[in-house]
């Protein structure tokens, strides 16, 4: 069984002692406790501070004792990478600062952006504290020192990555920085690469505790960093090593789980059978943390209503788009409609009362649809058949579909894996899983001209999806829909053909996991793809009327509050606003 014990109280305690939280300025940290860093310069002290660095992956801003901003801080990225990507609508009802993000109308004074900036630098600050303290712990062995500092550097790179994909240029702040007022002159992938190379070279393969970043998790982050830099040959070397030898921190070799949906099951996550996880945001329930450790970042993304007969306490956010749902259709060969997936639509119950009859879509579908999207008439995990409109906050605003991957099973409530608020649970968020390694490898092989090998990697993922043991079933054991999926059997002959197939596969496999927007930007196709999406989706959702994606929307604005807070005494700005804002 998964080890649900977390060190949350220790981490909060340690962070308060050394004053990790941000006050007026995002890194202007003043001690607020009675113990100094010197008091933490012990083996147990530095481990406690390291645990605090991991704690930030939950998205909750422990530094100020609040869960405020957890939805935009969470590395599930449902706000910045989901509702901006064409995969999802904001959901709930009209209005709010998230609507501006969804419509590509973010302004520098958007408080959600300030939350994300402060959160990323809070995490970076925690990692820097670990590195500074570890250097002065007298009785650490060489192996212990390398393990602690390797984890801290991998985490620092992770926080920087999730800040970079949102804001672009960031200031570099490390353990030796004395003045936090540093310029944001360029993208910091080289600094992240150096941190990750150190982690890859120095971290052990195994740990006794669930959730710690090991050698191969660092390698995976490094490979992704190299892909972002288009260092294809270097990335291939790392990716090939991961595929050949990569193991989780229990020493079990990475491989795809036999059943796709087991990635999103509490009873599988963290066990020896969990061979696909590379890095999870570790969540727990009923651990005396006032629900802080239970995935606050996705706490809004449940069916609306909060009744005992449905999961969650609220709130109907992050609703899959019709465009995404249509992408799961398959043709007579069991392949996706890559170039015209919106030519025909998956049937939905828009405007149909839950008490009225409804016939589900009868065409062939990729089976991953019903592990990704909640739709009328299909079992919603073990909560019974999705009733449609009764669980939707406002169909007219955001449509008839609901998220599924972030939702716990009803059985999890009876096994104490759900917190009393019913909006948080022990269901981890997969930050990085082995399927993404295969997709990154496919991308690299395409860039290097190895189309056949790229197709092999993509087909591994499609073969797993085709496993009938992983299909959603009706109570009588029959498939819940007409599932039909096949592998690619005709060779890809051009780079464009291979790219198009690989990118479509990545959308389907990782749908609603917060990656797509950043991939579209990285591939240089965001403007074309997202404006095409808006032209289609606005015919379904009037709230998108007038929205458009412009060149500068590839990154978000630097929060004005941070620009103001980091001015020099003479009024000179150290942070520059991104172009177009």
Please give the residue ranges for each predicted region.
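Bacterial Sec-dependent N-terminal signal peptides
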Residues: 2-6, 18-44, 192, 223, ...
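Bacterial N-terminal signal peptides
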Residues: 11-19
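Short acidic-aromatic linear motifs embedded in glycine-rich loops, typified by GG[WY][YF]DAGD(H)
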Residues: 23-151, 155-166, 171, 176-177, ...
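Structural signature of alpha-solenoid helical repeat junctions
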Residues: 141-148, 155, 188, 207-214, ...
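Hydrophobic, small-residue-rich alpha-helical packing segments that form membrane-like cores
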Residues: 172, 176-267
């Amino acid at each position: 069984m998964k080890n649900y014990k977390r060190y949350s109280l220790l981490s909060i305690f340690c962070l308060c002692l050394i004053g990790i939280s941000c006050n007026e300025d995002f890194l202007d940290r003043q001690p607020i406790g009675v113990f100094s860093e010197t008091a933490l310069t012990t083996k147990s002290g530095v481990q406690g501070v390291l645990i605090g660095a991991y704690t930030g992956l939950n998205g909750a801003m422990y530094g100020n004792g609040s869960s405020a901003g957890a939805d935009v801080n969470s590395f599930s990225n449902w706000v910045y990478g989901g509702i901006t990507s064409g995969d999802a609508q904001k959901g709930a009802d009209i209005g709010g600062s998230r609507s501006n993000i969804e419509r590509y109308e973010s302004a520098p004074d958007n408080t959600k952006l300030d939350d994300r900036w402060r959160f990323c630098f809070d995490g970076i600050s925690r990692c820097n504290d670990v590195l500074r303290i570890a250097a002065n712990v007298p009785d650490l062995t060489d192996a212990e020192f390398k393990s602690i500092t390797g984890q801290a550097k991998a985490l620092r790179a992770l926080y920087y990555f999730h800040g970079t994909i949102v804001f672009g240029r960031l200031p570099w702040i490390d353990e030796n920085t004395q003045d936090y007022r540093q310029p944001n002159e360029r993208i910091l992938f080289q600094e992240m690469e150096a941190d990750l190379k150190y982690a890859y070279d120095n971290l052990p393969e195994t740990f006794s505790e669930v959730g710690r970043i090991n050698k191969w998790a660092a390698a995976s982050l490094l490979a992704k960093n190299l892909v972002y830099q288009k260092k294809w040959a270097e990335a291939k070397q790392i990716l090939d090593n991961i595929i050949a030898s990569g193991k989780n921190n229990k020493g079990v070799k990475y491989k795809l789980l036999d059943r796709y949906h087991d990635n999103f099951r509490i009873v599988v996550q963290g066990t020896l059978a969990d061979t696909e996880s590379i890095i999870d945001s570790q969540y727990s329930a009923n651990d005396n943390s006032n629900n802080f450790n239970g995935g606050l970042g996705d706490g809004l993304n449940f069916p609306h209503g909060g009744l005992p007969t449905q999961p969650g306490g609220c709130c109907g956010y992050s609703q899959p788009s019709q465009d995404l749902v249509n992408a799961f259709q398959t043709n007579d060969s069991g392949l996706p409609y890559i170039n015209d997936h919106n030519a025909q639509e998956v049937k939905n119950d828009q405007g149909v009362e839950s008490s009225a009859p409804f016939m589900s879509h009868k065409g062939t579908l990729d089976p991953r649809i019903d592990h990704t999207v909640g739709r009328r008439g299909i079992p919603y995990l073990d909560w019974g058949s999705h009733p449609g409109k009764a669980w939707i906050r406002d169909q007219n605003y955001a449509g008839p579909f609901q998220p599924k991957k972030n939702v716990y099973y009803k059985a999890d409530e009876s096994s104490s894996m759900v917190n009393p608020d019913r909006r948080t649970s022990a269901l981890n968020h997969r930050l990085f899983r082995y399927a993404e390694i295969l997709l990154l490898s496919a991308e690299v092989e395409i860039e290097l001209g190895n189309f056949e090998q790229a197709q092999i990697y993509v087909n591994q993922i499609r073969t797993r999806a085709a496993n009938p043991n992983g299909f959603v079933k009706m109570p009588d054991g029959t498939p819940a829909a007409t599932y039909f999926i096949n592998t690619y059997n005709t060779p890809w002959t051009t780079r464009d053909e291979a790219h198009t197939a690989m990118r479509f596969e990545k959308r389907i496999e990782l749908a609603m996991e917060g990656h797509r927007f950043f991939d579209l930007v990285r591939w240089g196709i965001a403007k074309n793809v997202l404006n095409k999406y808006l032209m289609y989706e606005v015919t379904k959702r009037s709230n998108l009327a007038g929205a458009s994606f412009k060149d500068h929307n590839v990154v978000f604005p630097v929060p004005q509050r941070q620009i103001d807070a980091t001015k020099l005494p003479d009024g000179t700005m150290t942070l520059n606003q991104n172009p177009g804002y």
